[in-house]
């Protein structure tokens, strides 16, 4: 028990020390605020002198409330007395601050403490200054009436939302509340005025506080007794919410005196409203609103606009018509801060919503001028001041939204044009249309004869291959395959190409077979010098004339001979082919008639017959497989062939190079065997062939023994053999070129 009592005594001592410190701090605050009032309660330049206590100033018409109407002066003497009291206060305020605490107490204690029931004498001493400075006001019904009319509210920002609702419903009605004692000391009012404690309970719903309109003496709310807290809690809310009710010997329509504590709450509320709506002060430029109101922010808040509402906006808008807050000098054509409808409530924290509100309010006159249908939709209803929230559901009115956006676009100087959105699937259809159009133009360009340059590579350019997803290299086989498969009739063309190559092989064999029959005297040791002398010239002539029509095919490797020739008009291409064929036939007949006995078949010397036939067969299969990548040729084994594959020495002379097609034709003509790809008849053994004699006269061991027998004249037959080999290669090359051109022209 003793320990408990000592603990309780220690706690009481600590509480007493804390209370003493708080009271001392409160007294210092009161003295400093009083000095500030005295310092700034004087005119600056030519501005009217406004009494901080009453918010009134003198005009030629009479005493006027700041931002309000003219006060009715029933008793002119009392008004003059009230105007003289601030001047008297200037002289005696410093003295009051000095000897105020020493004055005796003239005030009766309001009540007993709720806990101990003891009388708090300290509160009487702290309020002695107010009673000493207060004038002698007789106890009359006027005092109670003024108290009922002009009871003020302090620190509305710290109150809950229920106080606003109750304050709006009890305007003009009397609410009687039984006062409760408190240890909290009140603030000292301005010197020369009477004061009473006016406190409100922050947590009791049965004792609501008055609304902001009760600051206005023109809209009083009457209570018989002042409110004091029920407990001894000394929180910031209770300390800052202490206020006073000062009385003046005015009549009912006059105004009472107000202290700095009452003005502080109103000024704080006004400044908070101004700071929360800063864009409204620079909205005239219309640049700040457009920089912050972008599409990204609008869409982010739009999805929640049907659920998010500005807290307290309805109450502040409703009370703003009746409540006025001192803000600036009243000017004709300019209302007080309470009339500014382009400001938001302090509790609205969404920047995008603030900008939307300010934009709608400021530009409302322009919107009325631009679109008469704007009247159909009220932006800010008269009863509610909440913002217009757009619903993002499927039932949203698109016409109304489009009209609103059009108006915003017309009003704002910065035009923000939204990009047209492409629906899903529309882009794919558009891409398909572009691709079809591109293919059509490409075909038309290829069919046009004047727009066809001679191409030395594949029919499709590298750009076309890149467009179709093929390789970037112009000569790549993958691009050829891609282009070939992309054609509509690729299979039919592949089949026709296969048949054409078979026909080409047959004609090559037939052309090779007719040569030995005309070369019966090719192995004779004696030759005609006239023919020997004229043969080089004829060979060069044939070379030049043949190259005029087949130089394009000679310049391309065998792996690229599949390239489609220039696509021309069918009739023009057919006539050109017939002319070349007739010219070639004439030259061939003329050459055969001039030298009927000197035509010999150049052989691949130094290779055995069986080995040469096998090599020729595999080279032919590989070459044809490369030329026509058709499944018909995929079953055969392919060996890499080279244009220099038949590089052999002819009768001990220097080697010559011939294309693979020439070597194939010569080898098959010499050997006489027919391959399954070239169904040619085997020549008779009785026919004069150069193979038997050459087999006896020349060594067959890999071209090492190239000695000529004593009875042969190698010196004269060797150049003739070279010339005949060149003639045969050129002739077969021309045949192959013309057949390919004919085939490709048909395929086109």
Curated annotation (Swiss-Prot):
Phosphoserine PTM positions: 123, 140, 185, 201, 211, 412, 448, 473, 486, 496, 595, 642
Highest rank taxon of the organism: Eukaryota
BP GO terms, sorted: CENP-A containing chromatin assembly; chromosome segregation; regulation of DNA binding; regulation of protein-containing complex assembly
Comp. bias regions, Polar residues: 524-562, 688-699
Region spans: Disordered: 191-226, 512-574, 670-748
Location of cross-link Glycyl lysine isopeptide (Lys-Gly) (interchain with G-Cter in SUMO2): 354, 581, 586
Tissues where the protein occurs: According to PubMed:17256767, highly expressed in the thymus with lower levels in the placenta, small intestine, liver, skeletal muscle, and colon. According to PubMed:17823411, highly expressed in testis, and at a relatively lower level in thymus and bone marrow. Significantly overexpressed in many lung cancer samples, compared with normal lung.
Coiled-coil ranges (or none): none
A GO molecular-function annotation: DNA binding
GO cellular component, one term: nucleolus
Subunit structure, interactors included: Interacts with CENPA (via CATD domain); the interaction is direct and specific for CENPA since it does not interact with H3.1- or H3.3-containing nucleosomes. Heterotrimer composed of HJURP, CENPA and histone H4, where HJURP interacts with the dimer formed by CENPA and histone H4 and prevents tetramerization of CENPA and H4. Identified in a centromere complex containing histones H2A, H2B and H4, and at least CENPA, CENPB, CENPC, CENPT, CENPN, HJURP, SUPT16H, SSRP1 and RSF1. Interacts with 14-3-3 family members in a phosphorylation-dependent manner. Interacts with MSH5 and NBN.
Function as written in the Swiss-Prot or TrEMBL entry: Centromeric protein that plays a central role in the incorporation and maintenance of histone H3-like variant CENPA at centromeres. Acts as a specific chaperone for CENPA and is required for the incorporation of newly synthesized CENPA molecules into nucleosomes at replicated centromeres. Prevents CENPA-H4 tetramerization and prevents premature DNA binding by the CENPA-H4 tetramer. Directly binds Holliday junctions.
Protein's UniProt name: Holliday junction recognition protein
